[in-house]
Swiss-Prot record:
It is found in: Cell membrane; Membrane raft. Disruption phenotype: Inactivation of the gene results in a sporulation-defective phenotype. Disruption confers resistance to bialaphos. It comes from Bacillus subtilis (strain 168). The gene is oppB. Belongs to the binding-protein-dependent transport system permease family. OppBC subfamily. GO terms for cellular component: membrane raft; plasma membrane. Gene3D superfamilies: MetI-like (1.10.3720.10). Induction: Positively regulated by TnrA under nitrogen-limited conditions. This is Oligopeptide transport system permease protein OppB. Keywords: Cell membrane, Competence, Membrane, Peptide transport, Protein transport, Sporulation, Transmembrane, Transmembrane helix, Transport. The keyword Membrane applies.
């Protein structure tokens, strides 16, 4: 397992190098510059700003300098947020995005598995059909549409939750539901199909023949094996939640990394765009690695196959 993790860490470093390189040159190829905008600066001032930030140097020199900075976990200064570096923006925005993302992931896992298990236990009954309708709705409706519907119903009409902002737990409820709706629907479908397959397996029939009650069979034997596809989906789910947070944070006025990223695109703040992209890439790669390790812990067959490959 340690050899496997070591190899994955090496692959992560190579992947990050490619991401940093591609992101850097894409930003350089973008039309305009960080100081181009509706209000054009005098040429002298723009030249001084370019010299101050090292943007007047040859492209390869800028690239090598940026690689060295990223290797030291320094993403440079922000062009638009005065007196703040990209690291400062990440430090202030990530706890907010992490809180929202963690709440959405936990909500998606809890409700998705619950609905999937209920649908499997009551296969081809009204409970199963109800869950099917809910999952179709969750998969079909984009998160930003869900956000607008939740704001209209629960904030503007019923007045149960605030429309936007980030001051207390009440402000997290609607955005976390909007962010969790699609992954929750996928998890419910995965759990249902996997649970039905497990419930029809031989060892479940043997457990029932031994006189074990239905709850005991479900909790002790069925759910653990049925959760394997859900664990596999956790990596893509993390990516889905992170990318979805860009729009959700903007809609709900949440001061997280997603909102900073969207604002940086509008403001041509290239260092923030590159820094947040690299930071999110690190988070996603770590999530995928953790999911792979968890999968090996849950399913010993995977652990054995990895050990054989590493030998």
């Amino acid at each position: 397992m340690l050899k496997y993790i070591g190899r994955r860490l090496v692959y992560m470093i190579i992947t990050l190098f490619v991401i940093v390189t591609v992101t850097f040159f894409l930003m350089q190829a973008a039309p305009g510059g960080p100081f181009s905008g509706e209000k054009k600066l005098p040429p002298e001032i723009e030249a001084n700003l370019n010299a101050h930030y090292g943007l007047d140097k040859p492209l390869f020199v800028q690239y090598v300098s940026y690689l060295k900075s990223v290797a030291m976990w320094d993403f440079g200064p922000s062009f638009k947020y005065k007196g703040q570096s990209v690291n400062d923006l990440i430090s202030s925005g990530f706890p907010v995005s992490f809180t929202l993302g963690a709440e959405a992931i936990l909500l998606a896992l809890a409700l998705g598995v619950l609905f999937g298990v209920i649908a499997a236990l009551y296969h081809n009954k009204w409970q199963d059909y109800t869950v099917a309708i809910l999952t179709i709705f969750g998969i079909s409706v984009p998160s930003f549409i869900m956000a607008a519907v939740l704001q209209y119903v629960f904030s503007m009409k019923l007045g149960l939750f605030p429309v936007a902002g980030w001051d207390s737990w009440a402000y997290t409820f609607l955005p976390s539901i909007a962010l969790a709706s699609m992954p929750m629907a996928f998890i419910a479908r995965l759990s249902r199909s996997s649970m039905i397959e497990v419930l029809n397996s031989d060892y479940i029939r043997t457990a029932k023949a031994k006189g074990l009650s239905r709850p005991a069979v479900t909790v002790r034997h069925a759910i653990r094996n049925a959760l394997l596809p859900v664990v596999t989906y956790m990596g893509p789910m993390a990516a889905q939640v992170l990318t979805g947070s860009f729009i959700i944070e903007t809609i709900f006025g949440i001061p997280g990394l997603g909102a900073h990223f969207v604002n940086s695109i509008t403001n041509r703040d290239y260092t923030v765009i590159m820094g947040v992209t690299v930071f999110f890439s690190v988070i996603l790669l770590l999530c995928v690695l953790i999911v792979d390790v968890l999968y090996g812990i849950i399913d010993p067959r995977i652990k054995l196959s990895k050990a054989k490959k590493g030998a």
